[in-house]
Design a protein with these regions (language model features):
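PLD/PLD-like phosphodiesterase catalytic module centered on the HKD motif
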Residues: 1-153
Length: 153
């Protein structure tokens, strides 16, 4: 387990580091909001082949501020869901079976503030968090693609 309270490491840095350690992985992320800068980082991560899929859960309220990113999100992220969410969880499951859980205070945005994180490879923690994230996705949220379809058509 690793942990820190720092203003020098961003969650995108942690994701890239974890992927460099475990190889190609499926990723689940929850956050209140996302910024264009962070989305660009995810774009480059996906283009590098480090991820097989990225699943994202964002808060309804915060997405009103990022409507201009919706089309970009749909091009970069495999699935995006909107719900009442303030959690910041990052789950990485490699094709080799590695399981990494990161709990952080940072939204998927860039800031110069102190943020905290805890990284663990405990499979029980991962499995519990993944089940809870999947429940949010499957039972408590609306896919962004459904909203885009309604808005565009």
């Amino acid at each position: 387990m690793q942990s820190a309270l720092t203003n020098t490491v961003q969650i995108a840095d942690i994701l890239e580091w974890v992927l460099s350690q475990v190889g190609t992985s499926e990723v689940w992320q929850t956050s209140f909001s996302i910024s264009e800068e962070f989305l660009r980082r995810l774009y480059h991560i996906t283009r590098s082949g480090s991820t097989s899929a990225i699943h994202l859960i964002l808060d309804y309220k915060a997405t009103n501020k990022t409507k201009q990113l919706w089309v970009f999100i749909e091009k970069v992220i495999t699935t995006t869901h909107l719900t009442d969410n303030h959690s910041k969880v990052l789950l990485v499951e490699s094709v080799k079976g590695d399981k990494v859980s990161i709990i952080t205070s940072q939204n998927l945005t860039r800031g110069n503030r102190n943020e905290s994180y805890i990284i663990t490879t405990d499979s029980k923690v991962f499995d519990k968090l993944k089940a809870e994230v999947l429940d949010l996705m499957n039972n408590q949220s609306v896919p962004l693609s459904d909203i885009l379809t309604q808005v565009l058509y």
